[in-house]
């Protein structure tokens, strides 16, 4: 979706899988300002774990502070994703709540399952929800872009 918004100054980030010989080993967060951070990896000996991944909550905190703090000139934030790993960071949750209650546009992917903040976002009456899967992702992206154009 970000490619379709070229020329617009974006806030937020997307998450990229880290693979070795075809096997997923971790996740890297890439902010639209160019900052990057490895937020989870199978080799991280962390207290916080989601599945087989150790989660670096401090890295998520730093990324949230930088990428999700509202800045003048940014009217649209893209966030991929609001998931279990990201929600281990209270700073991430706090910054997301600030964006959700603010005057900027926000498009985010939200984990299919999850309690706490994940469920809270899905219950919000001021949020539009689309179900995204591999089969419909191009059509849904076009629908969201049209929705944004009318805002």
What does each of the following model-derived ranges do?
Residues 1, 15-20, 43, 48, ...:
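Short, flexible coil/linker segments at or flanking structured domains
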Residues 2-52:
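N-terminal phosphate/diphosphate-binding loop that engages ATP/GTP or pyrophosphate donors
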Residues 35-40, 52-56, 102-105, 131-135:
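Glycine-rich loops and low-complexity Gly/Arg-rich segments
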């Amino acid at each position: 979706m970000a490619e379709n918004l070229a020329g617009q100054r974006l806030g937020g980030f997307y998450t990229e899988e880290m693979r070795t010989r075809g096997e997923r080993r971790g996740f890297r967060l890439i902010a639209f300002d160019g900052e990057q951070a490895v937020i989870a990896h199978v080799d991280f000996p962390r207290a916080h774990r989601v599945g087989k991944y150790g989660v670096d909550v401090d890295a998520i905190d730093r990324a949230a502070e930088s990428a999700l703090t509202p800045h003048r000139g940014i009217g649209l934030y893209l966030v991929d994703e609001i998931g279990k790993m990201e929600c281990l960071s209270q700073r991430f949750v706090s910054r997301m709540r600030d964006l959700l209650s603010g005057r900027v546009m926000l498009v985010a992917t939200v984990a299919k399952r999850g309690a706490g903040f994940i469920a809270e976002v899905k219950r919000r009456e001021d949020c539009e929800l689309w179900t995204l899967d591999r089969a419909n992702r191009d059509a849904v992206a076009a629908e969201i872009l049209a929705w944004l154009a009318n805002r």
